[in-house]
Amino acid sequence: MYVLPGGVEIHAHGGGGRDFMECTEDAFRGAVQTHMKYGTTSIFPTLSSSTVPMIEQAAETCTKMMAEKDSPILGLHLEGHYLNMAMAGGQMPENIKNPDPNEYIPIVENWHCIKRWDAAPELPGAMQFGKYIPEKAFWLR
């Protein structure tokens, strides 16, 4: 038996020509397999700022895949959509907004696969969001 180091990918939007924003098992599987081929042992599929229906679709796919035996998926990473517009880089501006508990609480309560969520601390509502998220075993970045 050999023990070798492996990478834990905490921020990956896809791989092998597939994007996690496609929200399908085929896309998730293709991207994850590509990462595994090059030494990744565990991964947090990352979504760019997106709509709530897209987050829910990706979370459903992620939940199914995390339940598979020996799944390398540790949880879903949401990069936004609670970001500062001036610092949002390549994010889709129409999806950027301030944290709203009427939006994020149902997402968190319904989708336990979400484990990382990026948010800008200077936004209105961000302090409340920042206090709520760690209570749910998230990494807030």
What are these model-predicted stretches?
Residues 1, 58-70:
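Short amphipathic alpha-helices and their capping/turn segments at secondary-structure boundaries
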Residues 32, 56-63, 104, 130:
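Generic structural signal for well-ordered alpha-helices
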